[in-house]
Amino acid sequence: MRMEEIPVPEVGPLDVLVLVMAAGVNFNGVWAARGKPVSTLKMHPEQDIHIRGSDASGIVWKVGSAVKRWKVGDEVVLHCNQSCGECPSCNGEDPLACGYQKIWGYETNWGSFAQFCVAQSQQLLPKPKHLSWEAAASYGLTFFTAYRMLLGRANMQPGDNVLV
């Protein structure tokens, strides 16, 4: 891992550019550094960079031409799940079941460990006002891990009891 200056990424029609105020740390960064279980650079060779980081909080800096929900200046939290946006799962069912699904900042070139990050607009959530930038950047990936375990592997249903 090294620090280097690169151009600010361009946004596509459904993308958002975010000024990163805080970035969360998780085990994806360790895997990326070790190249195990997969090499992040070999996984997506379309660009000669890999910016780690799968969680962030920040301020919307620029929006793509088709983005409707977000505007410049919005305070947001970014979660890690990228999806196709076109399949039935993405359009009303469960985006976490999308067959295209990728973990942003691990299975993609761009992540949160940069001054600016580019993400799909559907990855953004409003930043809770009562949370600091750091606290807001810390829960995205862990939330989706728990969600997938409870609703996927454990097959939890409405009305089931859980211990938190």
Can you name each region flagged by the protein language model?
Residues 1-7:
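Short glycine/threonine/proline-enriched tight-turn/helix- or strand-capping micro-motif at secondary-structure
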Residues 2, 26, 59, 163:
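Conserved Rossmann-like nucleotide-binding pocket used by diverse enzymes
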Residues 19, 31, 43-46, 54, ...:
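NAD(P)H dinucleotide-binding glycine-rich loop of Rossmann-like/cofactor-binding domains
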